[in-house]
C-alpha cells in the first residue's frame, strides 16, 4: 500500500489559515471540552505528561557535544492524541536555543507531525512556529472568555514578543470592550515593534501606554498577561505585589513571576490541566517551581506547604463543562496557569491541515509506493 503525506511550509500554513485568531480560540475551546470528557491521550503511563525533554550538560569532554551554554536550551518531543471531530494523533518537536537570535533565527524552531490514528502513517509534516504561537495566545484568551470580567477594558502585556502579540490579538477577539493596552518590555526595539503591530492589526485598541515598571503596567488593569522569557533563578522573575492588582483582575500566566504566597492563596487558582502539574510535582520534587517555571507548579508548592488545599486548584475544563462556576464575583482575583499541551498543537494543526487539503495547499511527498520490508 502506498503512503504519502502533506508537507506544509510556513507560507503554506499562513495560506491555510494558521493565523485565524477567532478560529484558533474556538479550536482551543473544543479541545478543552474534549479534554474534560477524557477524549484524549498525552504521553506517559498515566497519559498526563507534557512531553519528553532533553537537557544539555554544562560541560563535556567530547568535542562538539551540545552544551547548556545559555538560557532556554532544550529539545522537546510532545506526542498526543485528540478525539472528537479531530480524531488525530501527532507530535510537536522543538529545539530551543537563545543563541539562535544572533543568527537571525527564532529562539525556538518547531515542527508538527500528524499521524493516522489506526496505522500511524504520517498525514502531514508542518512548520509549527506560527501554529504554536497562535495556540499559546489562544489558550489564555479562551480562558478569559470564562474568567475575565465582562466589562474588562484594560489589558497589560508584560513581555511584548511573539507570544505577547498572539495573546493580545486573542484577548481582543473575546473581550469586545478592551480598548487600552499597557506594555512593559525590555528593549525599545520590542516596544516599537509591538506598538506597530497594535496600530496595524488591532483597531479596537484606542490607547497604548508604555510603562517603565511592572508595577505601573499592572495597576488598574483588568487582564494582566505575562509572556516573558525567564532565567533559571527564581529571584530574577518579575515581582508582582498583590497591592498592585485591581479587584476583579485576571492574571494570565503562560510564563513565570514572583508573587507573595499569601496573595496567591487568597486568589482563585485555575490551571489548564491539574494532572499535568501533578506529573511535574512527581518528576521534579518540592520545590517544583524553580525547576518547572510555570506558575501552576507554584500552586502545587503552596499545597505542599499547607497554604492551600488540592481542591483550591481548579481545572478550566470543569468551568467549561459547568462542573465549577468559575468567576463568582466581580471582585475576586483569578490567576490562570497555562502549562501548554500537545493536544492544542494537534487540534490547531489538524484544522489547518484539513483546510490545506481542501484548498490544495502544500506539497504531497511519497513515503513509499510499497514498503520494502513488510
Language model features with spans:
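Adenosine-phosphate binding glycine-rich loop
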Residues: 10-18, 257-372
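NAD(P)-binding Rossmann-fold cofactor-contacting core
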Residues: 174-201
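Short helix-loop-beta connector
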Residues: 147-154, 177-178, 246
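Rossmann-fold NAD(P) dinucleotide-binding segment
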Residues: 219, 231-249
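Short glycine-/small-residue-rich Rossmann-like dinucleotide-binding loops
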Residues: 228-232, 255-256, 274
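N-terminal ligand-binding/catalytic initiation module
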Residues: 1-135, 139-141, 151, 343, ...
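Glycine-rich Rossmann-fold phosphate-binding loop(s) that bind the pyrophosphate
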Residues: 160-161
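Short acidic low-complexity segments
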Residues: 206-221, 239-240
Amino acid at each position: 500500500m502506498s503512503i504519502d503525506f502533506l508537507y506544509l511550509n510556513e507560507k503554506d500554513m499562513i495560506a491555510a489559515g494558521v493565523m485565524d485568531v477567532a478560529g484558533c480560540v474556538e479550536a482551543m475551546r473544543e479541545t478543552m471540552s474534549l479534554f474534560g470528557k477524557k477524549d484524549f491521550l498525552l504521553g506517559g503511563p498515566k497519559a498526563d505528561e507534557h512531553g519528553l525533554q532533553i537537557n544539555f550538560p554544562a560541560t563535556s569532554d567530547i568535542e562538539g557535544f551540545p552544551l547548556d551554554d545559555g538560557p532556554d536550551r532544550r529539545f522537546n518531543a510532545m506526542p498526543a492524541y485528540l478525539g472528537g471531530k479531530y480524531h488525530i494523533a501527532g507530535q510537536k518537536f522543538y529545539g530551543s536555543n537563545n543563541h539562535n537570535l544572533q543568527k537571525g533565527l527564532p529562539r525556538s524552531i518547531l515542527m508538527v507531525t500528524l499521524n493516522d490514528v489506526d496505522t500511524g502513517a504520517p498525514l502531514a509534516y508542518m512548520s509549527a512556529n506560527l501554529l504554536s504561537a497562535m495556540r499559546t495566545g489562544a489558550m489564555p484568551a479562551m480562558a478569559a472568555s470564562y474568567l475575565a470580567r465582562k466589562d474588562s477594558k484594560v489589558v497589560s502585556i508584560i513581555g511584548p514578543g511573539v507570544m505577547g502579540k498572539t495573546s493580545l490579538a486573542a484577548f481582543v477577539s473575546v473581550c469586545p470592550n478592551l480598548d487600552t493596552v499597557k506594555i512593559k518590555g525590555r528593549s525599545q526595539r520590542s516596544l516599537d515593534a509591538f506598538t506597530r503591530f497594535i496600530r496595524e492589526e488591532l483597531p479596537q485598541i484606542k490607547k497604548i501606554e508604555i510603562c517603565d515598571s511592572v508595577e505601573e503596567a499592572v495597576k488598574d488593569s483588568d487582564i494582566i498577561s505575562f509572556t516573558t522569557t525567564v532565567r533559571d533563578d527564581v529571584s530574577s522573575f518579575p515581582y508582582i505585589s498583590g497591592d498592585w492588582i485591581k479587584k476583579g483582575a485576571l492574571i494570565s500566566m503562560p510564563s513565570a513571576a514572583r508573587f507573595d504566597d499569601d496573595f496567591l492563596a487568597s486568589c482563585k487558582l485555575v490551571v489548564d490541566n491539574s494532572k499535568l502539574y501533578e506529573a511535574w510535582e512527581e518528576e521534579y520534587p518540592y520545590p517544583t517551581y524553580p525547576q518547572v517555571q510555570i506558575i501552576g507548579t507554584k500552586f502545587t508548592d503552596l499545597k505542599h506547604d499547607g497554604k492551600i488545599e488540592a481542591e483550591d486548584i481548579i481545572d478550566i475544563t470543569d468551568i467549561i463543562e459547568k462542573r465549577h462556576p468559575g468567576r463568582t464575583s466581580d471582585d475576586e482575583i483569578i490567576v490562570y496557569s497555562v502549562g501548554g499541551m500537545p493536544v492544542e498543537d494537534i487540534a490547531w494543526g489538524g484544522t489547518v491541515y484539513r483546510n490545506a487539503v481542501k484548498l490544495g495547499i502544500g506539497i504531497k511527498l511519497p513515503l513509499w509506493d510499497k514498503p520494502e520490508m513488510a
